[in-house]
Curated annotation (Swiss-Prot):
Encoding gene per record: pcm
GO MF annotations, alphabetized: protein-L-isoaspartate (D-aspartate) O-methyltransferase activity
Top-level enzyme category: transferase
GO BP terms, alphabetized: methylation; protein modification process; protein repair
Function per UniProt: Catalyzes the methyl esterification of L-isoaspartyl residues in peptides and proteins that result from spontaneous decomposition of normal L-aspartyl and L-asparaginyl residues. It plays a role in the repair and/or degradation of damaged proteins.
Source organism superkingdom: Bacteria
Species of the source: Caulobacter vibrioides (strain NA1000 / CB15N)
Predominant localisation class: cytoplasm
Name of this protein: Protein-L-isoaspartate O-methyltransferase
InterPro entries the UniProt entry points to: PCMT, SAM-dependent_MTases_sf
Locations listed in the record: Cytoplasm
EC number of the protein: 2.1.1.77
Length: 222
């Protein structure tokens, strides 16, 4: 990292208190979630071109045409997932690894799947830099889930499914929770599926969101 880039990141981090206040004002109030966000260096996950915007409450571009999510959405989704310290969490779409890192700080184990090999390798390097020992990665089709490790206490999907993600829901424990953006258009609904213990789910629509689509298969040559 160049000296100029380091300086930009340091200046951007001065915006952290403003970001944390914005999250609280928008309803992200869970102390553990807020602590996880506050102690995670978002600038580690943003490209050099955007280091000076690392602590903005906005989504930013990363490699492979993907994005690192807006901190508010990261906080909202993590809070809605109601993760417990002993939870085993499945994340669909590792991306930069930022959301993965937040989840790793509030759960026991995080299993994360990414369809872009480039993103997976970059995220794994960041996990090593941070010394994370409770993250297990997989290069593969996130829409298929991770049946070998199921059932999970919690599942988070960070790309938009066209309809209810039934295959993923089938990999939840009976009282598990899944949070995912759902919809075919540019604007989707963020939904929370809570297992009722009897094979059914209570579905709550949290808000409108904009996510990249959940694509089948793995990316070629990326």
């Amino acid at each position: 990292m160049s000296g100029g880039t380091t300086k930009a990141a340091e200046n951007a981090k001065a915006d952290l208190p403003r970001l944390m206040k914005a999250l609280r004002d928008q309803g992200v109030t869970d102390p553990q979630v807020l602590k996880a966000i506050e102690t995670t260096p978002r600038d580690l996950f943003t490209p050099d071109l955007f280091k000076d915007r690392s602590w903005e409450d906005s989504a930013l571009p990363i490699a492979c045409g993907q994005t690192i999510s807006q901190p508010y959405i990261v906080g909202l989704m993590t809070q809605a997932l109601t993760v417990e310290p002993r939870s085993r969490v499945l994340e669909i779409g590792t991306g930069s690894g930022y959301q993965t890192t937040i989840l790793s700080k509030v759960s026991r184990l995080v299993y994360t799947i990414e369809r872009y090999r480039t993103l997976m390798k970059e995220a794994e390097a960041r996990f090593n830099t941070l010394g994370l020992t409770n993250v297990i990665t997989k290069f593969g089709d996130g829409g298929e889930g991770w049946a070998e490790q199921a059932p999970f206490d919690r599942i988070m999907v960070t790309a938009a499914a066209e309809d209810d993600p039934k295959r993923l829901l089938s990999q939840l424990k009976p009282n598990g929770v899944l949070v995912a953006p759902v919809g075919k258009g540019p604007v989707q609904s963020l939904r929370r599926y809570a297992g009722d213990g009897k094979g059914g789910f209570r579905v709550e629509i949290l808000c409108d969101v904009r996510f990249v689509p959940l694509l089948a298969g793995v990316a070629k040559d990326q």
